[in-house]
Amino acid sequence: MGKSGLYFSLICFYTLFPSSFGNPSRCTLFIGASSYHSDPCGSNHPRCTWRLDLFSLTKDQSLSPPCPGLVTYSQYHKPYSLYVFPHWIAKPDRRGLGYYSASYSDPCAIQCPYLGCQSWTCPYTGPVSNPHWKYTSDLNFTQEVSSISLHLHFSKCGSSFSFLLDAPGYDPVWLLSSQATQIPPTPAPLIQDSDLQHILEPSIPWSSKILNLILLALKSTNYSCMVCVDRSSLSSWHVLYDPLKAPSSPDPQAQSILRPSLAIPASNITPPFPWTHCYRPPLQAISSENCNNSVILPPFSLSPIPDVSRPRKRRAVPIAIWLVSALAAGTGIAGGVTGSLSLASSKSLLREVDQDIDHLTRAIVKNHDNILRVAQYAAQNRRGLDLLFWEQGGLCKAIQEQCCFLNISNTHVSVLQERPPLEKRVITGWGLNWDLGLSQWAREALQTGITLLALFLLLIVVGPCVIRQLQTLPSRLQHRSQPYSLLNYETNL
């Protein structure tokens, strides 16, 4: 009885929680517009491993740098060693070979520690004591000239960290963020992600590549579908293929590389790039043959464009709707005229307030430029002092104090400058000057007269229609009360 109960419990547990066993996961690094997947890792196998190329990381980050206005001081060179900084954790301790212990708690921002970065890229969080990272178990890496073998514990996947150089300067060379992802259910391709040059080549911007793919997909559907591109992940694949170029006889040694979730036939079109893969419609898979009749697309969805050109049937509108519409129109016109005149009376006041805001904004921008110029002088002196104390490890290490950096942001002032004038944001009238230099009682009398005139014109327009409908109402009611003719009882049936 005990064994049967144990077996029954195990069967129920595996049935209710199938995702905790045998569901492969991994950790994905994001830099710029590119992503790098680790080896399969999870709770059972918590060590996530990457083999990264430093030159590829540099190209990927140059497309989307973390700090657009970053002042670059140090440049990557092969003999330089690397430091790794997980963000917002305990202060690092050097452990030889150019490595830092994976813990940091400095109140200074290290994500973009130099001048030129904006406030949203360098958030100030203050000293943070948790979570605590251990260098050997949570994060470690080995550097071999231009390549890095990175090892990260799966529990720390979801954080961000930077790679710095053992060289003068403070700018991060690479800023990476991580996120836990699931391995797609389709079999992994035999070729690496970097070999799909028509999708992941870092030298070509993502936007131009996506536009070409959207144009090609629209041509294949004769512009009858809307294309929605999903660039969040490449876990599912779509294929665009030419059915006229399908291989006639299958190769017995060919293997299926991947099975796309969507295959779109496109014949008699000229793609913006050559076909790069071989798709077999009977197998519904990309094979290792060299027929070159298809191209792999990022995930997107096709939906038919709604037809809005259908004719509408006209129906007679009852008299009650005419009356309600007339009353509503009269009330709306009166309210609109009154509201426009009321807003126009405060136009001069808004203009004066807008001028005061403009003067204050100019003064703040001028003070910001002066502070930024002083900060640049201080940064220049800091570089020179670091070169003088280079043998002691830099200025901060020589004086045994924390290295702080000045982060000056002008985001709020720029947003204030880009906003339209206060008069355009508040007044939504007809653009006419209703002030006319009149007193308050004269403006109120003018408003009342315009309202009465609008109601009188509305009565002239709608009144004849209402009277005509009321005159014909008795005859319509009489015809409706006698739908059948009376029988003449004097006639012989």
From Swiss-Prot:
Glycan-modified residues: 140, 222, 292, 407
Organism: Human T-cell leukemia virus 3 (strain Pyl43)
Motif (CXXC): 225-228
Residue segments, region Fusion peptide: 316-336
Keyword DNA damage tagged: no
Job of this protein: The surface protein (SU) attaches the virus to the host cell by binding to its receptor. This interaction triggers the refolding of the transmembrane protein (TM) and is thought to activate its fusogenic potential by unmasking its fusion peptide. Fusion occurs at the host cell plasma membrane.
Designated name of the protein: Envelope glycoprotein gp63
Binding partners and assembly: The mature envelope protein (Env) consists of a trimer of SU-TM heterodimers attached by a labile interchain disulfide bond.
Any Gene Ontology biological process: symbiont entry into host cell
Span of the annotated motif CX6CC: 396-404
Presence of the UniProt keyword Nucleus in the record: no
Annotated disulfide bonds: 225-228, 225-404, 396-403
Coiled coil: 344-390, 400-432
